[in-house]
C-alpha cells in the first residue's frame, strides 16, 4: 500500500519516510461438514502455506507478505497431512473485497484443480459480510480483518459480532464459542485474559477453521523535510513524532 502526503505540485519531489507491515490480514475460514473433514481442511491450508502460492501472488511488487502468525506470537500450525487424504471433488469459495482476493481466489482455484478438486468461486462485491445469503452455500470464505490499537480486543469482537461466524460453525459450536468468550472476558487479570484469547484462536487454527493468508506492506512518502510520519495498525496517520527541519536563515 503506497500512501503519499503532499500537495499536487509537491508530488514530483516526494520520497519514502516510513514503511512497515500492517497487523491487519486477509483470512480464510473453512466450514467443517460432511463435505469437508478436519484433515481435508488441513490439507487445503497446508497447500496454501507450503506450496509457495502466497509468495507468488501477482498483486503488485512488495504489496503483501505471506502471514506466519495471526498476531505476533500467535503462529500458524503446520501438519504432516497423510498421503491418503484426498480433497472433495467440489468445493465452493465465497469471498469479499479487497481486490487482492480476486487473484488469491483464482490461484487457489487452479491449485486445488491440480489436486482433483473443482473450486466454484462466488464474489460478494462488498467490504464486509453485510449480506450473508451467499454464505449458506460456502465451504470456504475469504475476507480481511483490520486490526485496531487493541489487537486482542479487536479479534475478540470479531468473533462475537461478525455475521460470518454463525455460518462457519453449527449452532452448538457457535454457542460454545460465545460462552468461551464470555468466560475469557470476565478474567480479571489482563495477561491471563489475553493468553486465554490466544488459546481460543490457536484452537481455531489447529482445527483448520481459520488461517491468516497475508498482511500488507505499507510505504508512506512525503515531500522533503517531512519526517517521523507513520501509520497505526488501524490505518490512521500518526503525527506525534513528525517533525520539520528548522527554516534556514
Predicted regions and their residues:
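Ligand-site clamp/hinge motif
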Residues: 1-13
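Periplasmic binding protein-like
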Residues: 3-5, 115-160
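Structural motif
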Residues: 5-8, 33, 95-99, 144-146, ...
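Extracytoplasmic/periplasmic, Sec-exported soluble proteins
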Residues: 22, 32-37, 45, 96-100, ...
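Append "and occasionally in soluble cytosolic enzymes with long acidic Gly/Pro-rich linkers
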Residues: 36-110, 114
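Extracytoplasmic/peripheral linker and loop segments enriched in polar/acidic and small residues
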Residues: 42, 54, 63, 121, ...
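A generic structural motif
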Residues: 69-73, 115-128, 170-171, 243
Amino acid at each position: 500500500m503506497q500512501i503519499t502526503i503532499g500537495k499536487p505540485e509537491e508530488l514530483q519531489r516526494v520520497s519514502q519516510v516510513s514503511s512497515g507491515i500492517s497487523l491487519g490480514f486477509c483470512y480464510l475460514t473453512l466450514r467443517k461438514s460432511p463435505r469437508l473433514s478436519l484433515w481435508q481442511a488441513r490439507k487445503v491450508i497446508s497447500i496454501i502455506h507450503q506450496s509457495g502460492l502466497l509468495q507468488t501472488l501477482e498483486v503488485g511488487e512488495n504489496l503483501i507478505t505471506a502471514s506466519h502468525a495471526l498476531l505476533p506470537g500467535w503462529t500458524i500450525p503446520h501438519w504432516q497431512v497423510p498421503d491418503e487424504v484426498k480433497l472433495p471433488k467440489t468445493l465452493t469459495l465465497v469471498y469479499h473485497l479487497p481486490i487482492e482476493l480476486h487473484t488469491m481466489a483464482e490461484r487457489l482455484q487452479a491449485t486445488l484443480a491440480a489436486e482433483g478438486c473443482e473450486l466454484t468461486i462466488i464474489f460478494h462485491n462488498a467490504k464486509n459480510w453485510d449480506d450473508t445469503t451467499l454464505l449458506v452455500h460456502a465451504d470456504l470464505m475469504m475476507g480481511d480483518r483490520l486490526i485496531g490499537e487493541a489487537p486482542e480486543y479487536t479479534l475478540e469482537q470479531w468473533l462475537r459480532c461478525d455475521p460470518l461466524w454463525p455460518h462457519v460453525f453449527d449452532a452448538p459450536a457457535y454457542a460454545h464459542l460465545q460462552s468461551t468468550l464470555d468466560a475469557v472476558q470476565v478474567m480479571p487479570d489482563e495477561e491471563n485474559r489475553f493468553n486465554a484469547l490466544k488459546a481460543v484462536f490457536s484452537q481455531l487454527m489447529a482445527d483448520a477453521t481459520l488461517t491468516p493468508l497475508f498482511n500488507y506492506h505499507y510505504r508512506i512518502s512525503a515531500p522533503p523535510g517531512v519526517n517521523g510520519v507513520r501509520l497505526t495498525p488501524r490505518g490512521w496517520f500518526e503525527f506525534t513524532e513528525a517533525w520539520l527541519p528548522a527554516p534556514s536563515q
